[in-house]
């Protein structure tokens, strides 16, 4: 089963210092997903970070679906910035120097995240998706309401919102939620 992991285990991943580049990449991608509201790998890899303070994207999974596009808009938290700086390419996208197709890259990332988790003594089965599951779980445990968490991960349900500035209002809630979840990592 793809399990969420504990706050302690997220800290273990964050604080790991692997020598191998592929494991550093695994650590950084996992943490970026956690820091950026459980963003999916495809959306993360397609995003142009050049001169951006916010991350705005339409979930790849929701594009062209009947339910409408799921737009996510979040302020990039400070924790994410050094990781982005480390891997950003001239084009503004993240580049880890691999010439894989996206599918093969995704498989490789999943394998390396599992290897990293094992190496640092995490017993749970950890995959890239675990960052997303854990982000939601930890937020819920901190008392953040589900609607805000669903917005963060791009799963807002009702698309016909009466509130004109829905995204602006939700971004504020999302930013506060992410701050609370990330501050919890500092304890």
Regions found by a protein language model. Name each.
Residues 39-40, 72, 132:
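Short, cationic motifs built from Arg/Lys/His that form the positively charged side of catalytic pockets
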Residues 4, 10, 77-123:
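Active-site/catalytic core of tyrosine-dependent DNA strand-transfer enzymes
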Residues 36, 45-83:
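Conserved tyrosine-mediated DNA breakage-rejoining catalytic core shared by Y-recombinases
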Residues 59-64, 153-184:
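Catalytic-site neighborhood detector that most strongly recognizes the C-terminal catalytic loop/helix
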Residues 15-21, 110-155:
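Short, basic (Lys/Arg/His-rich) helix/loop patches that form interaction surfaces
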Residues 10, 23-27, 106, 110, ...:
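Short, leucine-enriched amphipathic alpha-helices that occur as contiguous helical runs
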Residues 1-41, 45:
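Basic, Lys/Arg- and aromatic-enriched nucleic-acid-binding interface segment
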Residues 18-20, 60-75, 97-105, 122-127, ...:
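Short, contiguous acidic/charged loop-to-helix segments that flank catalytic cores in large enzymes
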């Amino acid at each position: 089963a793809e399990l969420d992991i504990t706050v302690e285990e997220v800290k273990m991943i964050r604080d790991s210092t692997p020598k191998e580049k592929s494991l550093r990449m695994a650590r950084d991608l996992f943490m970026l997903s956690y820091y950026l509201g459980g963003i999916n790998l495809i959306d993360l890899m397609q995003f142009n970070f050049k001169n951006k303070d916010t991350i705005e994207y339409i979930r790849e999974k929701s594009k062209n679906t009947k339910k409408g596009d799921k737009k996510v808009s979040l302020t990039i938290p400070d924790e994410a910035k050094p990781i982005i700086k480390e891997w950003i390419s001239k084009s503004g996208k993240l580049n880890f120097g691999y010439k894989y197709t996206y599918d093969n890259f995704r498989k490789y990332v999943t394998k390396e995240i599992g290897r990293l988790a094992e190496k640092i003594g995490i017993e749970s089965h950890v995959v890239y998706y675990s960052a997303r599951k854990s982000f939601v779980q930890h937020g819920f445990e901190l008392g953040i309401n589900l609607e805000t968490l669903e917005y963060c991960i791009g799963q807002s349900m009702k698309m016909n919102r009466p509130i004109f500035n829905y995204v602006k209002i939700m971004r504020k809630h999302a930013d506060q939620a992410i701050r609370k979840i990330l501050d919890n990592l500092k304890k």
